[in-house]
Regions:
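Short, solvent-exposed amphipathic alpha-helices that sit
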Residues: 48-63, 132-136, 158-178, 204, ...
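Short beta-strand->loop
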Residues: 126, 149-158
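Hydrophobic alpha-helical segments within soluble ligand-binding/sensing domains
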Residues: 124-148, 227-229, 244-262
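Hinge/cleft segment of the Venus flytrap/periplasmic-binding protein
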Residues: 24, 248, 252-296
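Alpha-helical recognition/docking segments in bacterial nutrient-uptake
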Residues: 2-7, 18-131
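Hydrophobic alpha-helical
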Residues: 91-108, 179-230
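Short beta-strand elements in bilobed, periplasmic/extracellular small-molecule ligand-binding domains
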Residues: 60-77, 150-151, 168-185, 193
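Generic beta-sheet signal
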Residues: 115-116, 223, 244
Length: 296
């Protein structure tokens, strides 16, 4: 009769010991690093920036590093000098025109990574525009004969030029017609699929369908139209869009900035895949965060 009592007492003592020591065990947190990165931007708005920052902060948190955000100053040289004086580990640029700051930072020696653009001689992280061009054209040719497909280029957009360059061979093989975008461009008759190679032209074409200035039976394939992308897809204003992954771009940019600061990275271009989003796949788990970034 005593044996069950002894076992019960032992179980109680074990439970007390687990409560005292087991639940007080603390998981080691990453050691705080002195590395400090600055994301330099033109403005502090938009879902793209929000997701980019999440990617940066996630990559930094793994090694206990810090990321702050600053807006571009009117005095670029003074701002670059301040980065150097305050021992910033690296600067990550998300700027419409990064050239002046790149020049200023080169004079201070502060490592720099460019996001969203490909600039020779620098570490850059952007979407895979060459792949995006191929994906758009492949979808277009699956929807209509080459004679019904019109490619709309945009020479003012560097990323558009990369997309068009990637499809030159297919353009020639299929004798596809290209049209340079302008604010007063005229879309000739006889085409059912419009392939827009820039965000600007895609946005205007979608607005044209919405307003009735363009026929509603056009199939428009293009580049991410921004925070209205879900409405554009749901409303049939566009048939499919290639979309950047800003979270992945931010994560990769931070990793490359760390390597660059340690002297372990040559200048090069690093790209993130740009999935093709349409009404059939926009609600898949892997695409929801790209289509509805504000919900994340």
């Amino acid at each position: 009769m005593k044996k069950p009592g002894v076992i019960s007492l032992a179980c109680i003592l074990a439970a007390i010991a687990l409560f005292i020591w087991g639940f007080n065990l603390q998981h080691p947190e990453p050691e705080i690093s002195e590395n400090r990165y600055v994301l330099l931007i033109d403005n502090d708005t938009g879902a793209f920036l929000m997701q980019l920052r999440k990617g940066l902060q996630e990559a930094a948190s793994i090694q206990g590093e810090r990321v702050s955000v600053q807006s571009l100053s009117a005095n670029v040289a003074a701002q670059a000098a301040e980065f150097s004086a305050s021992s910033v580990t690296a600067v990550i640029l998300l700027l419409v025109n990064p050239e002046p700051m790149l020049l200023a930072l080169s004079e201070t020696g502060v490592p720099v990574v460019v996001v969203g653009q490909a600039i020779d001689g620098y570490v850059c992280v952007t979407g895979n525009d060459a792949g995006a061009g191929l994906v758009l054209l492949d979808r277009a040719l699956s929807m209509a004969a080459p004679s019904s497909v019109l490619i709309i280029t945009d020479e003012e957009d560097p990323r558009s030029r990369v997309r068009v360059d990637s499809i030159q061979e297919t353009l020639q093989q299929n004798q596809l017609l290209t049209l340079q975008w302008s604010d007063d461009v005229y879309i000739p008759a006889g085409f059912s699929v419009l392939v827009s190679m820039s965000r600007r032209s895609t946005r205007v074409l979608a607005d044209g369908v919405a307003s009735g200035t363009l026929p509603s039976d056009y199939h428009i394939l293009g580049v991410d139209t921004g925070d209205n992308r879900a409405l554009d897809l749901e409303g049939g204003l566009v048939s499919a869009l290639v979309v950047d992954n800003p979270y992945a771009m931010g994560y990769i940019a931070l990793e490359k900035a760390r390597l660059l600061a340690n002297g372990n990275l040559p200048t090069s271009l690093y790209t993130c895949e740009m999935p093709l989003i349409d009404r059939q796949n926009m609600y898949l788990n892997e695409n929801v965060k790209l289509v509805f970034p504000l919900l994340q």
